[in-house]
Amino acid sequence: MFGWAVTFLIIALIAALFGFTGLAGVATHIAWILFVVGLILFVVFLLLGRRGRPPL
C-alpha cells in the first residue's frame, strides 16, 4: 500500500511542476488517502501484535 502511495506521490510531484491542476490534484489526494489508510493499518496491526500468541 505504501508503494502505491509513493507512486502517486511521485506522479503528483512531477505534475506539480506544471501546477496543481487536474492530474496533480487527483494524484496528491490519492497518495494522501493511501498514506493515511496505510498508517492506520500499521498502528492497528502493531497494537494487535502486542497481545501475544495464542496458547498451543
Curated annotation (Swiss-Prot):
In the record, which residues are listed under signal peptide?
A: none
**Which controlled-vocabulary keywords does the entry list?**
Cell membrane, Membrane, Transmembrane, Transmembrane helix
Q: Which InterPro entries match?
A: DUF1328
Q: How does it sit in the membrane?
A: Multi-pass membrane protein
Transmembrane segments annotated in the record for this chain: 1-21, 29-49
Pfam families, per this entry? DUF1328 (PF07043)
Out of the domains of life, which is the source? Bacteria
Q: Belongs to which family?
A: Belongs to the UPF0391 family.
Q: What is this protein called?
A: UPF0391 membrane protein Noc_0482
